[in-house]
Amino acid sequence: MKLLDKIIDELNDHLMDGVLNEQAFQNSAVYGLSYLTVPKDDSPQRPYTWMDDNIKEVANPDDSYAFSIYHRCNGIAFKDVPQQTFGDGNGLMNMVCEMTAIVYSDRYKTNYTQEDILMKISAGLNHTFTRTQMGTSGLQKVKATVLRANNNSTAVFTGEYGQEANCPLAMNSVYFGIVYQLEIIAHSSCLSCTNC
C-alpha cells in the first residue's frame, strides 16, 4: 500500500474542496508527495514527483498557474502505541512524519497576499481524517498538524533548488513552505496490504 501517497492525495483533496474551493484557485497545479533530485555533475537540484509510475518534474514556481502545491517528507519518527488491553501487543505502530508543503501562487491571479494564503493553507492542513475518508479499517488515526511556516521566499527557493539556482520570483510571486506533521497510527498488517 502506498500509504503516504494516499494520505497526501486525501490532504490535497481536502484543501481543494475546502479552504481553496473558490474561483481564485481553480487554475491550480496540485502535486502529491515529491522528492528532491540528487544533482549529478552540474545538473541542478529540483523537485520531482511520481505520477502513474512515471517521474515528472514539479513545475513550481510556474506562473501559468494561479496556485501550486507539493509535499515532501523530511523525516519519520516512530513512537510506541500504549496498549489498551492485556496481551502480547496490540499490533499497532505510530509513525510521525515531518512534512513540508511548498506553495506558490500569483498574487495578481488569486488576489491574496502571502500571509492570507499561508493562513488558508494552515487552516486546511490542520485536519484529522476518519477511517471512511481513508478507505481502510487498518488505519486507526491520521492527523495533520501545522507546526510552523517559512515565508522567506528566497530561502525556501534556495532550499528546494540549491544555492546556484537563479531565483525567478517576481514581485507578485507568493512562495513559502509550511512544516507540518502527519501522525499515523495503523495496524502493522495495514502496511503490507494492497486493498486500498
Where are these regions (language model features)?
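Short, charged interaction patches at domain edges and termini
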Residues: M1-A29, F86-L92, G138-C196
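Small/polar-rich, solvent-exposed N-terminal microdomains that initiate assembly or binding
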Residues: M1-F86
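Generic serine detector
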Residues: S28, S34, S43, S64, ...
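Sequence-level detector for tyrosine residue identity
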Residues: Y31, Y35, Y48, Y65-Y70, ...
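Low-complexity, serine/threonine/proline-enriched polar segments
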Residues: V38-D41, Q45, H127, R131, ...
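Ordered hydrophobic segments in well-structured contexts
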Residues: S64-K79, N90, N94, E98-I102, ...
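Short acidic, gly/pro-rich beta-turn/loop elements at beta-sheet edges
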Residues: V81, K109-N111, C190-T194
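Extracellular/virion structural assembly segments
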Residues: F86-V96, T100-G135
